[in-house]
């Protein structure tokens, strides 16, 4: 069964990677799909994020990385995915994700949403937090995979 793990991943964190690794054990194929959102100004381009993720998941043979725009359910159908995987860090994530799952179910009744609780050691990590710490020159190696840490250091050089 194919699962889709969509997100902005700007940048991918160890929390995201935890969800990807666990989903890869549950499904025959996991597609990590980087959303191209024209309404947002990301730090990294979709192609840069795709490259970061590819390097971070190279050890997972059943994980593919792609980019997409538009409705997640339309992309899931196009790729033959039957499940949308979502990670939950804190209770407030559940509120937003449940609303999205209900909306997706209305749009595509054949798709299921699977919520995976992020490992406790990653429950505080968000892409926004990582960018803020990197911007202020703080340590990030415990928050993101090495290729991402390198890209962040290049983006926010210490002065």
Curated annotation (Swiss-Prot):
Location, primary (coarse class): cytoplasm
- Residues annotated to bind substrate: 8, 40, 72, 86
Q: One biological process GO term for this chain?
A: coenzyme A biosynthetic process
GO terms, molecular function: ATP binding; pantetheine-phosphate adenylyltransferase activity
Q: GO CC annotations?
A: cytoplasm
**Record keywords:** ATP-binding, Coenzyme A biosynthesis, Cytoplasm, Magnesium, Nucleotide-binding, Nucleotidyltransferase, Transferase
Cofactor(s) the protein needs: Mg(2+)
Which compartments does it reside in? Cytoplasm
Record has Magnesium as a keyword: yes
Chain sites annotated for binding ATP: 8-9, 16, 87-89, 97, 122-128
Q: What class of enzyme is it?
A: transferase
**Site feature: Transition state stabilizer:** 16
Reaction catalyzed: (R)-4'-phosphopantetheine + ATP + H(+) = 3'-dephospho-CoA + diphosphate
Q: In which pathway does it act?
A: Cofactor biosynthesis; coenzyme A biosynthesis; CoA from (R)-pantothenate: step 4/5
- So what EC number does this one have? 2.7.7.3
Instruction: Relate the assembly described in the record.
Output: Homohexamer.
Q: Which family does it belong to?
A: Belongs to the bacterial CoaD family.
Protein purpose: Reversibly transfers an adenylyl group from ATP to 4'-phosphopantetheine, yielding dephospho-CoA (dPCoA) and pyrophosphate.
- According to UniProt, the name of this protein is Phosphopantetheine adenylyltransferase
Q: Which organism is it from?
A: Synechococcus sp. (strain JA-3-3Ab)
Q: Which gene encodes it?
A: coaD
């Amino acid at each position: 069964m194919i699962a889709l793990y969509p997100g902005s991943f700007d940048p991918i964190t160890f929390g995201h990677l935890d969800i990807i690794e666990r989903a890869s054990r549950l499904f025959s194929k996991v597609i990590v799909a980087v959303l191209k959102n024209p309404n947002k100004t990301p730090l990294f381009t979709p192609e840069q994020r795709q490259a970061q993720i590819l390097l971070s998941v190279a050890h997972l043979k059943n994980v593919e990385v792609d980019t997409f725009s538009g409705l997640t359910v339309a992309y899931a159908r196009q790729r033959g995915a039957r499940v949308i995987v979502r990670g939950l860090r804190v209770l407030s994530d559940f509120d937003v994700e449940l609303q999205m799952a209900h909306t997706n179910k209305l749009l595509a009744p054949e798709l299921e949403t699977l919520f995976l609780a992020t490992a406790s050691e990653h429950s505080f990590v968000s892409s926004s937090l990582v960018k803020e710490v990197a911007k202020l020159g703080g340590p990030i190696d415990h928050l993101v995979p090495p290729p991402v840490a390198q890209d962040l250091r290049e983006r926010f050089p210490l002065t």
